[in-house]
Each structure stands twice: as structure tokens, then as C-alpha cells.
């Protein structure tokens, strides 16, 4: 019985041994005593040394080791996939496909209408990107030959973002469309709604020309100019923050003031004036620039000029009782409390009455007159119509507002009989604010509008060539049905974002019926992610991300 038990034990473990070692153990068990065989089986050294090398048995890995290997592989594959996606996206943007050329007629003989777009801002570019440009002869007229990503413009004067990272050439945008687009680097200065013509003047250097352009449809998206509210001295002594040239000018003034102040004695009152930076306007542009300026002083200038950086004063002047009035009160209070912590001097209920070369004269909420000395003054408040918009207003009776071009619910210019549309900051309509988000959605809406307008034009052409009354009736029904599908423009507010300094941001979000209020460092990451996603091209996203990484590791570039 004992020997049989031993044999069963040997055979039960025989899978662990090779054939030779198996037969050897059986023979050994038959010829030796039970105790000797048992001792052999219990001798771990013999089993490990003589049997293990021939078995191929692998020890089971721990859960954490297996998980670690899987995670490492997943990260590696993700990095490879991400690199491939980035490379492909950049290649696709740099190598556009062949475009359909412009022509006077379509293959069926119907007329191809001309659509002229004035401007290269948010509304105009949104229309151009979403429009099927094969349906019209599309012409873009703008004195600025690039699109500017304005939400990140306040980051550029102090070097957080480089200007080249937030611009995209108009010709590049136009070249990526399916149909050919003509572009004129020129400024429209007169529109004739009666004869449907536009007078433009070249803004290109060494290439002056005047040109008359005919249109069937005209979209005015020329934006707005800064509104000084008639305050004396603003145009002469302050800097605005709407264009690349404005950011470059502010950067030059900041660096010049700092260098001049460094050459003066700390007790000199002129030094204190030069180191006083004043921002007028408590909207997103003014708030974000003040925050960026404070960050530059605290995070960069303090390293290289520690004593001087302590003397720099940032002041934000706002005529209303609060800054960022489009945000929820909780977020407004959060931003104002943070500004106090950052030592940004908030002057609320303070209205600027006059500006001279060194001082702002302002009226406080108590009615007192206060003089605020400054070294650099940035005016970031209010919009006013441009000259071409003012000119157009005088030619249409219905245009009786000074705040902007009046439009209906389909973005058609009042009094223009359906041939002129207006979008963006150059317009005025109750409930629509002069923001990039509004202009972007207006551009998307018009792209769909013109798609349906093309369909109606084609149905009308077919109706004029119909052979019998039944076909005419059928086409009329289709026209009525298509016209009924053109809905009014409805703005979908998705929320508002603002950077408030010290790597913190606020977000007032609307998702369906729900509303969310976010504030803090996590919101700053969301702010970055949202603006990266909103960048016009993949190239812009890469450059902006690299700028942020550069600031994190190397600091801001303060050179001019």
C-alpha cells in the first residue's frame, strides 16, 4: 500500500518532469525503500537542480507587476498614436487638396452668385470655414491678412504667448476650402446697397490700388474700433488691446518704463510714476491683461529685478460697481478677492474724465476728483462702429442706431432687402453681445443659410426652364418648403471664461439647462484646454501649448 501510494504521488507530479526523469523516478521507487524515495522527493535541491531546467515552468507574476507592464505599454502606444495624429494633422494642413475653380456659371448653365465677405475676424472666418465655397464665387476683403485669436491676446504683451502662435493667414484659411476663394488685402470704405457694389482701397505696402467689387450677397464682419466715450486724451496717450500692433506697443512701453525707472533713485517720484501700470476697463480683456501683468511681475521680474519689482503697482479702473459683470456674482466676488490678494488696486465706480501724458483724472463714486499717475495706460473698454459701418448706416433709413449695424433675426441688415448681412462686433441686436462666441455662431448660421439660399436659387432657375405647369407647381412647393427650413438665428450661450492670475481662472458654464460655476487652479487647466480646442488650426494648438510649456520651464521672454 505504501509503495502504491508513493507511485501515485510520483505520477501525480509527473507533469513537472521530463520523460527521462519520470521513468527514472519510477524505477528508483520500485528498487528502493519507501523512506529513501520519500527523502528523494523531499530533497528540494535535487528537484530544483535536476528537474526544473527541463520543465519550462514560469513563476506567476504579481498583479501590480502585470498592471505596471500593461500601463507602460498603453502609454507607449498612446504616445505613438498621438505623435502620428499630430504629424498627420500638421501635414494635412500644410498640404491642402485641389480646389474647384471659380466660374460665372454652374455646369447646368445657372448663374454662380458672388458672395463678398468683409473682414477676417471671428464671424468672417467662421463663415469661411463652414461655408461650401463651391456654391458661390467667394471673395474676402480685409486690410488684415490674418485671423487673430483674440481670447489669448492679453497674454501676449508680457510674453506668456507669442504673437505668431495666435495668428493664421487668411490665404491659408481660404486655401483649405473646397472651392477657390479670392482674397484682397484691402479696406472697404464705401458700400452702395442700391447698385450692389463695394469700393475698396489696398492696404498692402507698395501696392496701392482702388477697386470696385460687385456682389450678390455681402457679409459685413469688419468688427469695431475702441470706444473712448469722448474722453479727452485717450487716443493720444493710451494704448488699446485689439490688434497685434497694440500688443507690440504695450510690450515696448512696459519694458521702456521699467528700464527708465531702473536708472532713477528709489526716492524719485518719477520712478514711482513709471512703475504705475493702469488698465481701464473691467471686462474680460482688461481683467486678463491686469492678471497677466501681475503674473509677469511676481513670477519673472522678481527673479531678475527683485527690489524694483516690489515697487510696481497695477491698477484696474472700472466705472461700474463690479468687474466681469457678465459672470455670476459668486465668481465676480472670487475674482475681486483674488485681485486684492495679488495686490492689484481695484478702483470701482471710478470714471475717467481726462487723460494727459502722465496722469489720469477720474471721478470716484463719492464724487471726488482723483489724479492717478501712470507710466503705461491700457484702454480696454467699449466698442464703436468703424468708418465703413458708419457710412453704410447713412445710406439706409432703418439704420438709426449709433451702437452698430441693426440686423433682424436672420442677421440681415435692416433696409438692405436681403442682400446684405452683418455679423460680429459691428452689429447691434438685443440679446447678442460683442463676443467671439456670438460671432462664431453667427458665422456658422450664415454658412447654413447660404447653403439653403443656393438651393432656392437652383429651384428658381429650374422653374424658369420648366416645361409644364405641374413641374412649376412641384418646384414652387419645394421652394416654399426650403424657405420654411431657414430658421431664425438662435444664440446658444455655452458660458464664459476668464483668467484672473496666479494660475487661477473662473468659468461660468451652461450645459443645457444646467449651469456650473467653477473657480480656481483646476479651472485654469480647463481654461487652457478650452482655448486650445478653440484655436483655429492644429498648428496654432501646437504653438500655444509649446509657449505655455516654455513659460513653465524657462519663464517669459521679456525682450522686445
Swiss-Prot record:
Residue interval of the organelle targeting sequence: 1-41
What does the entry give for GO biological process? glycolytic fermentation to ethanol; regulation of apoptotic process
Keywords associated with the record:
FAD, Flavoprotein, Mitochondrion, NAD, Oxidoreductase, Transit peptide, Ubiquinone
Catalyses:
a quinone + NADH + H(+) = a quinol + NAD(+); a ubiquinone + NADH + H(+) = a ubiquinol + NAD(+)
Write down any Gene Ontology CC term.
mitochondrial membrane
* Chain positions recorded as NAD(+) binding sites: 275-311
Q: What class of enzyme is it?
A: oxidoreductase
* A GO molecular function held by the record: oxidoreductase activity
Primary location class: mitochondrion
- Keyword Ubl conjugation belongs to the record: no
- The EC number(s) given in the record are 1.6.5.9
- The residues that the entry says bind FAD are 114-144
The keyword Flavoprotein is assigned to this record: yes
Protein origin, superkingdom: Eukaryota
Where is this protein localized, as stated in its record?
A: Mitochondrion intermembrane space
Q: Which family does it belong to?
A: Belongs to the NADH dehydrogenase family.
Question: Could you share any additional remarks the record makes about this protein?
Answer: Present with 4930 molecules/cell in log phase SD medium.
Function description: External NADH dehydrogenase required for optimum cellular growth with a number of nonfermentable carbon sources, including ethanol. With NDE2, performes the mitochondrial oxidation of cytosolic NADH under these growth conditions. Regulates the mitochondrial glycerol-3-phosphate dehydrogenase, GUT2, also involved in cytosolic NADH oxidation.
- Entry protein name: External NADH-ubiquinone oxidoreductase 1, mitochondrial
Organism of origin: Saccharomyces cerevisiae (strain ATCC 204508 / S288c)
User: Which gene name belongs to this protein?
Assistant: NDE1
Amino acid at each position: 500500500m505504501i509503495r502504491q501510494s508513493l507511485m501515485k504521488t510520483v505520477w501525480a507530479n509527473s507533469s513537472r518532469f521530463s520523460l527521462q526523469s519520470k521513468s527514472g523516478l519510477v524505477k528508483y521507487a520500485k528498487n528502493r525503500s519507501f523512506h529513501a524515495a520519500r527523502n528523494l522527493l523531499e530533497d528540494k535541491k535535487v528537484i530544483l537542480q535536476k528537474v526544473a531546467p527541463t520543465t519550462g515552468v514560469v513563476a506567476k507574476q504579481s498583479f501590480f507587476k502585470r498592471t505596471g507592464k500593461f500601463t507602460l505599454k498603453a502609454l507607449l502606444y498612446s504616445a505613438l498614436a498621438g505623435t502620428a495624429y499630430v504629424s498627420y494633422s500638421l501635414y494635412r494642413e500644410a498640404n491642402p487638396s485641389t480646389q474647384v475653380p471659380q466660374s460665372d456659371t454652374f455646369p447646368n448653365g445657372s448663374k454662380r452668385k458672388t458672395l463678398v465677405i468683409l473682414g477676417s475676424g471671428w464671424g468672417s472666418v467662421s463663415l469661411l470655414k463652414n461655408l461650401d465655397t463651391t456654391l458661390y464665387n467667394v471673395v474676402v476683403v480685409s486690410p488684415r491678412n490674418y485671423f487673430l485669436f483674440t481670447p489669448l491676446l492679453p497674454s501676449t504683451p508680457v510674453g506668456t504667448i507669442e504673437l505668431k502662435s495666435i495668428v493664421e493667414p487668411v490665404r491659408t484659411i481660404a486655401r483649405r476650402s473646397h472651392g477657390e476663394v479670392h482674397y484682397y488685402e484691402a479696406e472697404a470704405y464705401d458700400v452702395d446697397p442700391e447698385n450692389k457694389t463695394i469700393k475698396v482701397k489696398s492696404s498692402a505696402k507698395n501696392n496701392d490700388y482702388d477697386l470696385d467689387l460687385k456682389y450678390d450677397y455681402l457679409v459685413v464682419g469688419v468688427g469695431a474700433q475702441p470706444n473712448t466715450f469722448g474722453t479727452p486724451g485717450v487716443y493720444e496717450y493710451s494704448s488699446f488691446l485689439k490688434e497685434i500692433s497694440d500688443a507690440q506697443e504695450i510690450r515696448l512701453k512696459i519694458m521702456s518704463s521699467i528700464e527708465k525707472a531702473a536708472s532713477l533713485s528709489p526716492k524719485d517720484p518719477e520712478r514711482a510714476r513709471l512703475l504705475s501700470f493702469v488698465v481701464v476697463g473691467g471686462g474680460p480683456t482688461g481683467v486678463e491683461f491686469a492678471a497677466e501683468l501681475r503674473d509677469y511681475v511676481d513670477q519673472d521680474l522678481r527673479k531678475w529685478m527683485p527690489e524694483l519689482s516690489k515697487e510696481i503697482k497695477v491698477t484696474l479702473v472700472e466705472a461700474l460697481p463690479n468687474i466681469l459683470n457678465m459672470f455670476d456674482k459668486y465668481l465676480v466676488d472670487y475674482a475681486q478677492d483674488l485681485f486684492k490678494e495679488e495686490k492689484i488696486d481695484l478702483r470701482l465706480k471710478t470714471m475717467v474724465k481726462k487723460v494727459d501724458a502722465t496722469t489720469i483724472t477720474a471721478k470716484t463714486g463719492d464724487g471726488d476728483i482723483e489724479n492717478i499717475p501712470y507710466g503705461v495706460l491700457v484702454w480696454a473698454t467699449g466698442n464703436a462702429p468703424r468708418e465703413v459701418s458708419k457710412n453704410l448706416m447713412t445710406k439706409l433709413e432703418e439704420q438709426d442706431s449709433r451702437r452698430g449695424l441693426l440686423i433682424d433675426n436672420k442677421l440681415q441688415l435692416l433696409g438692405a432687402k436681403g442682400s446684405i448681412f452683418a455679423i460680429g462686433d459691428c452689429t447691434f441686436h438685443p440679446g447678442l453681445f460683442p463676443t467671439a462666441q456670438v460671432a462664431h455662431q453667427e458665422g456658422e448660421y450664415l454658412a447654413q443659410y447660404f447653403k439653403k439660399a443656393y438651393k432656392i436659387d437652383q429651384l428658381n432657375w429650374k422653374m424658369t426652364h420648366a416645361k409644364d405647369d405641374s413641374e412649376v407647381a412641384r418646384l414652387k412647393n419645394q421652394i416654399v418648403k426650403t424657405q420654411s427650413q431657414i430658421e431664425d438665428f438662435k444664440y446658444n450661450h455655452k458660458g464664459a471664461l476668464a483668467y484672473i492670475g496666479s494660475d487661477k481662472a473662473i468659468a461660468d458654464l451652461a450645459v443645457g439647462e444646467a449651469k456650473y460655476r467653477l473657480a480656481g487652479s483646476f479651472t485654469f487647466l480647463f481654461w487652457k484646454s478650452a482655448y486650445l480646442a478653440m484655436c483655429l488650426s492644429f498648428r496654432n494648438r501646437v504653438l500655444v501649448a509649446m509657449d505655455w510649456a516654455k513659460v513653465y520651464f524657462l519663464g517669459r521672454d521679456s525682450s522686445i
